[in-house]
C-alpha cells in the first residue's frame, strides 16, 4: 500500500485523542490522528511524525498523521489494518478462490469480514516491547465484546496486524486491559483461532511481511 508524499513535523501536544498540534518548523498546524490508542511511545512532545495533506472541504483539519517512530517506523493509521489483512490472505494461508464479505453481522455487532463463511475480526497493533506486539494499547470494551460473541459461536478468527516490522510475536496486553486478556483466553478455549502478521513500513509504503505467532502466556 503506497503513501502519498509525506510532510515531516514534530508533535507539540495531543488533544482529545484524535487531534495533534504539529510543528512544521515554520508554522504550527492541527492534524487528525487516526488512532484511538494511547500511543505513549509514539506520540509525545517532540516526537517525530509524518503526515499527509488532506484536500477536502469536508475535513476541518488540513493534515492527517500517517507515521510515527519508535526505533522503527510505525504506521499510525489504525483503519489500514483491514486493507492490510486482505493483502495478507495468501501469507496467512487464507487465500485462493475465496468469498470475502465485509461488515458481517453477529448478534448485535458487526465484525470486519467473512471468509468463505468464517467470521474474521481484525485488530491493529502499534505497541511493541522487546519484540512482542501487545494488544490493546487502550481498554477496549468493543473488542472484548467481539471476542465473547465469537466464543459463543464457537468458531471464527481474530487477526492482529502489526503495523511495524519489529514484532516477533503478538499477545494480549493484560496490564492495559485484563478483561480483553480474559476474553481472548476464553475465546481460544471455545474454538476461536488467532493469527498475526507484521509489516514492512517505509516513508513510501506499508506492506505485509510475514506471519508471526500469537502467544498465550500462562498466568
Predicted regions and their residues:
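Non-catalytic C-terminal interaction segments of nucleic acid-processing enzymes
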Residues: 2-3, 7-10, 22-24, 139, ...
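Conserved catalytic cores of phosphodiester-cleaving nucleases, focusing on short active-site segments
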Residues: 111-137, 149-150
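Short peripheral tails and domain-boundary helices/loops at the edges of structured domains
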Residues: 68-91
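A short acidic/basic microdomain associated with nuclease active sites
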Residues: 90-106
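Short aromatic-glycine-enriched beta-strand elements
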Residues: 16-21
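Beta-strand/loop nucleic-acid-binding surfaces
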Residues: 27-41
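OB-fold/S1-family single-stranded nucleic acid-binding modules
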Residues: 57-73
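Flexible glycine-rich surface loops and low-complexity tracts that mediate binding to linear polymers
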Residues: 44-56, 198-199
